[in-house]
């Protein structure tokens, strides 16, 4: 079986991005561009992958880790020079080598597989992946002879007027006989408009040597979209987003408006889940089956189990167990865990807290650094006061307890099972099982005090107007 290798070119500075972030690390649907390329290449069961890095090498290595080896291109002298930097790692190996660019995130594993198969079937030393472009400006042109054989690849800046009219373009992806590739790379020259060593020049070298050079024209030009600036990044993101959304819909997920639904590449969604417009699902989020994700919700790196309803809320690094619900306008912060069939209502914030099964936190409440048991009712306006200005403190509320509205729970306290907190209390001590905690001043009614305040005059005027109606 023929060995398969790959070289990913990721050394370009990407000055047109006008960014501090290394170009190939700009994300497309939640994953850096170069990671998209590596992931699709990996699906072809490669024997070894080398990524050529330059500016920002450490950041690329941190992102991709040990999934690939690395070669450094210290000076940017062209694509041919970049590939040559991998010679120490691959130069003596027999087999086929795929070359792809780290700023082309839309290529699929299937396209790479088809290129490998076509290359083998033609017995070629080099095969370039081409595409038909209605507007080929900026791309290298595939120049064929009268019988259709590839003679050379000409870059835009070096093309004659006639060559510039050719619409078959170089996608920047190749398959080579590995040893033949590195032998030819030592023969290319930099006598061109850019003064660089172009990888495509090896094609002409092979032709002059009488070796087989092939071209495989892919069906979908869209895959070949490279990213050199923010506009191209936006266009690539649109294509990837459409691809993700259509795949989910084929798997039984309902997207009310796919054009306004933003789902990252690693997100998983179960069947019969309904996603409304304006939703953003990011990172490693997992959504179960039969869920409802309401308009303008944003969910990041969270687990949403089957049957959960999320209404216009923000959830990050949290877990919602099956048949629970949240919203509208609530916020689950990191390490929030919402139990089965629990209810988190509107304008509620939960941070680093566990909410038990069937527990209800209806509205206008903050729950931080707390463990709440099952079947608890937390009244409106309750605040779990967890921070003393230096340290965070934990509160525990036992099963079947009741927290009255407008209560302040000053951590650290333990409220036992079957305990009751009277509305309006500020709780600073533990409450035992079956006890009620009440901490508020007694009501005192001041006779005639209403008439002492300015509101009394306003009320008198309103009352007179009401009589005239």
Swiss-Prot record:
UDP-N-acetyl-alpha-D-glucosamine binds at residues 9-12, 23, 73, 78-79, 140, 155, 170, 228, 333, 351, 366, 377. Its EC number is 2.7.7.23, 2.3.1.157. SUPFAM superfamilies: Nucleotide-diphospho-sugar transferases, Trimeric LpxA-like enzymes. It catalyses: alpha-D-glucosamine 1-phosphate + acetyl-CoA = N-acetyl-alpha-D-glucosamine 1-phosphate + CoA + H(+); N-acetyl-alpha-D-glucosamine 1-phosphate + UTP + H(+) = UDP-N-acetyl-alpha-D-glucosamine + diphosphate. Its main location: cytoplasm. Mg(2+) binds at residues 103, 228. It is found in: Cytoplasm. It comes from the Bacteria. GO terms for biological process: cell morphogenesis; cell wall organization; lipid A biosynthetic process; peptidoglycan biosynthetic process; regulation of cell shape; UDP-N-acetylglucosamine biosynthetic process. It is an enzyme of class 2 (transferase). Catalyzes the last two sequential reactions in the de novo biosynthetic pathway for UDP-N-acetylglucosamine (UDP-GlcNAc). The C-terminal domain catalyzes the transfer of acetyl group from acetyl coenzyme A to glucosamine-1-phosphate (GlcN-1-P) to produce N-acetylglucosamine-1-phosphate (GlcNAc-1-P), which is converted into UDP-GlcNAc by the transfer of uridine 5-monophosphate (from uridine 5-triphosphate), a reaction catalyzed by the N-terminal domain. This is Bifunctional protein GlmU. It comes from Ligilactobacillus salivarius (strain UCC118).
